[in-house]
Amino acid sequence: MSKTTSIQWGETVIIADADYIDRVAFHLTVNFERMIGRHIPQADMAKWVECVALDGGCRKPENANTQNDEKTHVILVHENTREQMDNFNPGTFIAKEECDGKQLDSQAFSGPLGEFLFHCIPSNEQRDSLKKTDILSDLLAHMADEEQVKRIVLIPDIESDSDTLNSLIPVLRHLDREHSDKRVTLLAMQPLSGLPCRTEILGYSLLAALGVKAEEIK
């Protein structure tokens, strides 16, 4: 958490398990290449985070000529043994000297929804305080105290381990009770109900980032 304490947060924060979304993107690529009969390139990271921000409640200015000054922070939590996401472009968390510099950490881009800023945080399953689930819970709780944060989008891996969702629910309930002005959205591959937050389907944003069009799968 020390890496995030001095950051001036914007109105929207996306907190994602990077290893999970990379794995889902891989499975979607394999399945849909077979289904539509063409090669699918790596997911466009910029396109994906813009779609996720829309899922979380961000909207473009009504006047297309108006500059959007909103900031969205994207926090990618990943295993410390992994250097990159294989199914996203760009996908390198922190570039080494010999790389071409296309890393995600501390980088930003601007688009119709404003500026997107990336932060990559490594986890370590061998240390309790650095386990991915703990980091996700801590980040979510931290955002509750950040007044300027109005929208939070959470993308955990609840498929591999049901304890992940169980550990997040108390924080989600706290946000729902004590910070009801914040819009919290959880993205998952399957519909969810009974959670103290909004839910959306993760697959839609990933398919858009992979360039799969609706007419191709009808």
Question: Model features per residue range: what roles?
Answer:
Residues L28-V30, I169-P170:
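"Short basic amphipathic alpha-helical interaction patches in structured regions
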Residues H119, S167-K218:
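Eukaryote-biased recognition of electropositive, low-complexity segments
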